[in-house]
Swiss-Prot record:
Enzyme class (EC, first level): oxidoreductase
Assembly and interaction partners: Homodimer. The 2-oxoglutarate dehydrogenase complex is composed of OGDH (2-oxoglutarate dehydrogenase; E1), DLST (dihydrolipoamide succinyltransferase; E2), DLD (dihydrolipoamide dehydrogenase; E3) and the assembly factor KGD4. It contains multiple copies of the three enzymatic components (E1, E2 and E3). In the nucleus, the 2-oxoglutarate dehydrogenase complex associates with KAT2A. Interacts with ABHD11; this interaction maintains the functional lipoylation of the 2-oxoglutarate dehydrogenase complex.
Note, other: The mitochondrial 2-oxoglutarate and 2-oxoadipate dehydrogenase complexes (OGDHC and OADHC, respectively) share their E2 (DLST) and E3 (dihydrolipoyl dehydrogenase or DLD) components, but the E1 component is specific to each complex (E1o and E1a (DHTK1), respectively).
Lineage: Eukaryota, Metazoa, Chordata, Craniata, Vertebrata
Gene Ontology biological-process entries: 2-oxoglutarate metabolic process; generation of precursor metabolites and energy; glycolytic process; succinyl-CoA metabolic process; tricarboxylic acid cycle
SUPFAM superfamilies: Thiamin diphosphate-binding fold (THDP-binding)
Family as reported in the entry's similarity comment: Belongs to the alpha-ketoglutarate dehydrogenase family.
Record: residues binding Mg(2+): D411, N444, I446
Official protein name in the record: 2-oxoglutarate dehydrogenase complex component E1
Length: 1023
């Protein structure tokens, strides 16, 4: 019997490929689709003759049947034919026919059953094959789409066509189909829209429509999305027959936009042929693409678009999308014009812009902002996202329906820069989402001189977007209408689903990396083809002329009209006498400055508060303002301790921060604190978000229960990213001066992962782009034996980048000297030693009449240090931030007796005071704390030095000599005293690593620096 079944299996014809069989077994949806066909199957019947005792007889009958089917009884003939046709067990056997008048009819019926069974199976398998074919196009059709306008490369870097994509009929066999099936009609599954109004189509037409939808100039990558509704939406947009239609008016608008894009670059090339401008030649379609996205978004209710982009095509975008005055752009090419504004300025292809205008297509107001950026590719991505989030927050746009972002990328940078990945992973986090960004990749298939095969390991440069289920639309940029359609769909996707979407413009770069570069050195064959390539404007104009949409004179008139606009603007640019960087401001703050951009005053009010306000905030900070909310027992003890401090009129570090935040919220200042684990605090000191111990995910933020009409407080744990998150918070702070935006590093050591944001945006941002920013960086810092990665926020690096002159003593008699210093510096660097001073510097950040970045080296061990407490008296009305905290002990009472004046900053003060007391030197050694390191407090330190005429001067720090503050403080302190005395050093020796990881070594080093600080004879041999 086994032999019979084996023979039958061998003889069974293969009607479909193994792929289709697997598909039919593993796809329950397909089974449901063909359920009505499967109802023809006969119920299982007994086959009692197939027993072991009769196997020899059955095998003899089978062999006889193979030689001559007519040599066996008709019932055996039917049985063997059914078995070979693949009938399931129990259905092959038909009962012997009775000898009656109706026997002939019964024989005919049995014969029909024999023939029907294989037909039904073939029908099912063919339908499954067609469904598998349709799905193959949907999944992999983009691999064989005609995307490269040069016709040289496959845009996906894979030269092999997927074997299961049919581009010719010889591949039908892969699905168990053949040419005889091409004219058969197949029912279409519900997962395709190629039928339009029809539910069934011939296979030939199915293939043709799939080729049109997925294998022409658009490659749609979307089947990795795990949401059926979203996949169906995309299928409907690209599969529906005739859906990609444009009116003649739309075609003329597209042509006009291509004219502007192309002729702008040609005008710049004629006038400044030797200037770098990073032109758009080869991807001129970018301008109409962006305008289409903006038009469609405006139609859907968006009234503010924030953009970020690299250098390629930036001037064209400024001119033809944002509509910057052409003469202002042309002025940037004039090397004779001087800048009117202070600061370094930046090259023309880095500048930003802000403009409000009427969208002529929708007749609605729209605001466009292009964020200024450095040459560090993709660094502006999170900045744009942060600014977008802020603008959405300020206008109450909780769903992203009014404010959106568009990010432009180069193909090499999009694949190569890690910040792209970090930014994508912010896209759907509750406190960071902007409800969808439209990404446009200018994929010119080259990175400077690097071939794509050397620039990425993934098939496409856009594959990073798959991690957030963003659909990716690849499009041949030499087909302007395909580009326009894809951009419309991208805008609609963002409006409908509020998720990211990527448009991959596969294009080429007609010139070198810049206009002076020779690309033939490294890409000779590509550039031979490019030299032959007809510009897209010429191609499209010829197409429209052939279609009768425009005629040649109309086309030429459009060109001459725009050329005239450029010439007139060029003439006006000759009248400009000076360059104004502030004309390129990307984030104006209306009403904050005077009309000429100056602060409205040069003073700062007291940052103190009344005792009632301090007490009220303290009481809320030490309680749970929500009923039936169970907190952790350990947290109850922390809140109880806070309550006792309030009663005793003292604050620790966490409570001082709470009071600064709470008071600003009362004044209508929004506060946003972001970073890793900031809700609780890395050191479990903050606890701004309380968690119910009995109800999962139930939380309470007491800070939002302080006042009836307070501003909202946002505190959010960030993703484990520094670069992306700091960039995001910088962008958030750009949007408004009336918000305190803080980013806290988990440890200060980790800020260098975000070094690009610090070096390119925060430090020089105002100098380059006339753009102030009040972001606050909280960087936990302190040498406590925790090793080289948990000790140092690298203060030496921040101080090195301060813009004051160490060798020039400013005019100390100048009115408002301290405020003028703050106004002129590029950022403020502080290291507070008391909670009260920390409270004041946070409040001062908002009460100042201008904005500067604030770098705070925050403590770790001081968070719970019993001496690191401040009284309410230090925070009452009339009090201010103390730039310098002078000695106030016995040494200050008898300054003539002081032998040494120690200057220090931060936590080391408490080590010094403890050691001084232990050595009984409180009258001989004075200790002055410099709380604000930059701008340097020349005026206050001069008073301190003059107060102790007999004292030698020493700087004491816990950091190593080549790190920390010494190299910054020493020359400035020497300048303060006109170099009358040396400034000695007491601290750790130079080292490569910031700190030791050995506790004993740490304590030995600490004792050594304390010995140096209090040994009054140690420096005599160096005099």
């Amino acid at each position: 019997m086994f032999h019979l079944r084996t023979c039958a299996a061998k003889l069974r014809p293969l009607t479909a490929s193994q792929t289709v069989k697997t598909f039919s077994q593993n796809r329950p949806a397909a089974a449901r689709t063909f359920q009505q066909i499967r109802c023809y199957s006969a119920p299982v019947a007994a086959e009692p003759f197939l027993s072991g005792t009769s196997s020899n007889y059955v095998e003899e009958m089978y062999c006889a049947w193979l030689e001559n089917p007519k040599s066996v009884h008709k019932s055996w003939d039917i049985f063997f034919r059914n078995t070979n046709a693949g009938a399931p067990p129990g259905t092959a056997y038909q009962s012997p026919l009775p000898l009656s008048r109706g026997s002939l009819a019964a024989v005919a019926h049995a014969q029909s059953l024999v023939e029907a069974q294989p037909n039904v199976d073939k029908l099912v398998e063919d339908h499954l094959a067609v469904q598998s074919l349709i799905r193959a196009y949907q999944i992999r059709g983009h691999h064989v789409a005609q995307l490269d306008p040069l016709g040289i490369l496959d845009a996906d870097l894979d030269s092999s066509v997927p074997a299961d994509i049919i581009s010719s009929t010889d591949k039908l066999g892969f699905y168990g189909l053949d040419e005889s099936d091409l004219d058969k009609v197949f029912h279409l599954p519900t997962t395709t829209f190629i039928g339009g109004q029809e539910s069934a189509l011939p296979l030939r037409e199915i293939i043709r429509r799939l080729e049109m939808a997925y294998c022409q100039h658009i490659g749609v990558e979307f089947m990795f999305i795990n949401d059926l509704e979203q996949c169906q939406w995309i299928r409907q947009k690209f599969e529906t027959p005739g859906i990609m239609q444009f009116t003649n008016e739309e075609k003329r608008t597209l042509l006009a936009r291509l004219v502007r894009s192309t002729r702008f670059e040609e005008f710049l090339q004629r006038k400044w042929s030797s200037e770098k401008r990073f032109g758009l030649e080869g991807c001129e379609v970018l301008i109409p693409a962006l305008k289409t996205i903006i038009d469609k978004s405006s139609e859907n209710g968006v009234d503010y678009v924030i953009m970020g982009m690299p250098h390629r095509g930036r001037l064209n975008v400024l001119a033809n999308v944002i509509r910057k005055e052409l003469e202002q752009i042309f002025c940037q090419f004039d090397s004779k014009l001087e800048a009117a504004d202070e600061g370094s300025g930046d090259v023309k292809y880095h500048l930003g812009m802000y403009h409000r205008r009427i969208n002529r297509v929708t007749d609605r107001n729209i605001t466009l902002s292009l964020v200024a950026n450095p040459s560090h590719l993709e660094a502006a991505d999170p900045v744009v996202m942060g600014k977008t989030k802020a603008e959405q927050f300020y206008c109450g746009d909780t769903e992203g329906k009014k404010v959106m972002s568009i990010l432009l990328h180069g193909d090499a940078a999009f694949a190569g820069q890690g910040i792209v990945y970090e930014t994508f992973h912010l896209s759907d986090l509750p406190s960071y989402t902007t409800h969808g960004t439209v990404h446009v990749v200018v994929n010119n298939q080259i990175g400077f001189t690097t071939d794509p095969r050397m620039a990425r390991s993934s098939p496409y440069p856009t594959d990073v977007a798959r991690v957030v289920n963003a659909p990716i639309f690849h499009v041949n940029s030499d087909d302007p209408e395909a580009v326009m359609y894809v951009c419309k769909v991208a805008a609609e996707w963002r409006s409908t689903f509020h998720k990211d979407v990527v448009v991959d413009l596969v294009c080429y770069r007609r010139n070198g990396h810049n206009e002076m570069d020779e690309p033939m050195f490294t890409q000779p064959l590509m550039y031979k083809q490019i030299r032959k390539q007809k510009p897209v404007l010429q191609k499209y104009a010829e197409l429209l002329v052939s279609q009768g949409v425009v005629n040649q004179p109309e086309y030429e008139e459009e060109i001459s009209k725009y050329d005239k606009i450029c010439e007139e603007a060029f003439a006006r640019s000759k009248d400009e006498k000076i360059l104004h960087i502030k004309h390129w401001l990307d984030s104006p703050w209306p009403g904050f400055f005077t009309l000429d951009g100056q602060p409205r005053s040069m003073s700062c009010p007291s940052t103190g508060l009344t005792e009632d306000i301090l007490t009220h905030i303290g009481n809320v900070a030490s309680s749970v303002p929500v009923e039936n909310f169970t907190i952790h027992g350990g947290l109850s003890r922390i809140l109880k301790t806070r309550g006792e401090m309030v009663k005793n009129r003292t604050v620790d570090w966490a409570l001082a921060e709470y009071m600064a935040f709470g008071s600003l919220l009362k004044e209508g200042i929004h506060i946003r604190l972001s970073g890793q684990d900031v809700e609780r605090g890395t050191f479990s000191h903050r606890h701004h978000v309380l968690h119910d111990q009995n109800v999962d995910k139930r939380t309470c933020i007491p800070m939002n229960h302080l006042w009836p009409n307070q501003a909202p407080y946002t505190v959010c744990n960030s993703s484990l990213s520094e670069y992306g998150v700091l960039g995001f918070e910088l962008g958030f702070a750009m949007a408004s001066p009336n918000a305190l935006v803080l980013w806290e590093a988990q440890f200060g050591d980790f800020h260098n992962t975000a070094q690009c944001i610090i070096d390119q945006f925060i430090c020089p941002g105002q100098a380059k782009w006339v753009r102030q920013n009040g972001i606050v960086l909280l960087l936990p810092h302190g040498m406590e034996g925790m090793g080289p990665e948990h000790s140092s926020a690298r203060p030496e690096r921040f101080l090195q980048m301060c813009n004051d002159d160490p060798d020039v003593l400013p005019d100390l008699k100048e009115a408002n000297f301290d405020i003028n210093q703050l106004h002129d510096c590029n950022w403020v660097v502080v290291n507070c030693s008391t909670p009260g001073n920390f409270f004041h510097v946070l409040r001062r950040q908002i009460l100042l009449p201008f904005r500067k970045p604030l770098i705070i080296f925050t403590p770790k061990s001081l968070l719970r240090h019993p001496e690191a407490r401040s009284s309410f008296d230090e925070m009452l009305p009339g009090t201010h931030f103390q730039r310098v905290i002078p000695e106030d002990g016995p040494a200050a009472q008898n300054p003539e007796n002081v032998k040494r004046l120690l200057f220090c900053t931060g936590k080391v003060y408490y080590d010094l005071t403890r050691e001084r007391k232990a050595r009984d030197m409180v009258g001989q050694v004075a200790i002055t704390r410099i709380e604000q390191l930059s701008p340097f407090p020349f005026d206050l330190l001069l008073k301190e030095v003059q107060k102790y005429p007999n004292a030698e001067l020493a700087w004491c720090q816990e950091e190593h000599k080549n790190q920390g503050y010494y190299d910054y403080v020493k020359p400035r302190l020497r300048t303060t005293i006109s170099r009358a005395k040396p400034v000695w050093y007491a601290g750790r020796d130079p080292a490569a690593a910031p700190a030791t990881g050995n506790k004993k070594t740490h304590l030995t080093e600490l004792q050594r620096l304390l010995d140096t600080a209090f040994d009054l004879d140690v420096f005599k041999n160096f005099s």
